[in-house]
């Protein structure tokens, strides 16, 4: 299905999304803090619940790229898998911000300081499938957290689930360096079963700057379901 169908075709409403008015579930400081010395040329492989304080690196991380990739099983008879990278911009109470566009996805690719690139409708090819560009200096001050998720478009209707998705990952890239420097990567190792979405990561504003946390929380939800849970 093309972009027109995605925008106006009416994705299914599933029943197992988080409850409405759910505040931010996971503080950025819950989990294991990891550190990185970019001068030593390192790159972090994050485990679930690991978080990286971006202000503690040896470079000023102001312009980053959040990239996601995956492999899916193909079928001669089934529909192509269409996985979508999206971001939910939350205020300090854990709800979608009203100060700027609070949902960045294939239908509205920009918000202040955030932009998605092209929408990969099939996931074909090697490397990153979709990318989100973040300029922390331009993020609206009311935005306290950015939840990064990947959702299978119309997954339930097509009987497509994360249990059929392999080698899924999200990675953080410093765009200010030339060549670009991969800072951290989180490989999704758990079986997704019948889930149709995954909260991959959280970017959270703290008094000292931003943190990046590997989440890896599976959901039986559409983009609309997740959006409703943050209202």
At which residue positions do the language-model features occur?
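Intrinsic-disorder/low-complexity signal
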Residues: 2-145, 149-231
């Amino acid at each position: 299905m093309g972009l027109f169908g995605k925008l106006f075709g009416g994705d299914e409403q599933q029943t197992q999304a988080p409850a409405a008015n759910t505040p931010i579930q996971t503080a950025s400081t819950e989990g294991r803090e990891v550190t990185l010395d970019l001068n030593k040329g390192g790159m972090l492989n994050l485990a679930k619940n690991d978080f990286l304080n971006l202000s503690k690196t040896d470079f000023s991380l102001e312009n980053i790229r959040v990239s996601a990739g995956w492999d899916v099983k193909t079928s001669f008879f089934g529909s192509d898998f269409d996985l979508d990278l999206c971001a939910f911009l939350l205020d300090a109470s854990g709800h979608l911000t009203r100060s700027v566009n609070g949902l960045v996805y294939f239908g509205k690719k920009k918000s202040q300081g955030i932009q998605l690139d092209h929408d990969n409708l099939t996931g074909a090819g090697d490397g990153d499938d979709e990318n989100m560009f973040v300029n922390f200096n331009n993020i609206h001050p009311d935005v306290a957290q950015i939840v990064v998720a990947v959702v299978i478009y119309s997954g339930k209707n097509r009987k497509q689930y994360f249990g059929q998705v392999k080698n899924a990952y999200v990675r953080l890239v410093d765009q200010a360096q030339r060549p670009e420097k991969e800072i951290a990567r989180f490989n999704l190792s758990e079986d997704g079963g019948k889930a149709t979405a995954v909260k991959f990561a959280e970017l959270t504003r703290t008094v000292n700057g931003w943190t990046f946390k590997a989440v890896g929380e599976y959901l039986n939800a559409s983009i609309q379901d997740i959006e409703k849970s943050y209202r």
